[in-house]
């Protein structure tokens, strides 16, 4: 019975459901990348090949995975600037990866609404780490979002402008 409640009822919910599954897999792939030291290409072929039949999902996941890796230094610098009394190296790996995914979406995926990126990162942290991790990820990403918005570094368009505060700033 529980499964039926989690299944999507509309095309929009189906896309959201797929995207959540993709983000979960990307988190797992980034974890494997950190732990194994294998190349991104190997990780993609080994852990993401089952998504190749759905081209849109595969491209989103591949792009998210590679964007985190390609921009990891900048992403980590942004995260480090918002974690007071912590060093990024001391964060739980899952929390760090969830934050990286959230920051990557905020910075490099202009079509994704900021609230979606933040919420999805929170859900990843809660599912794969702890309930407290969700609150931590929420606080850090909220601070990052506010700074990006205030400094004009939040480049959102299309669906990414669903956030009313962004729409007002652009008008």
Show where each model-derived region lies.
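N-terminal interaction/assembly modules
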Residues: 1-127, 132-134, 138-171
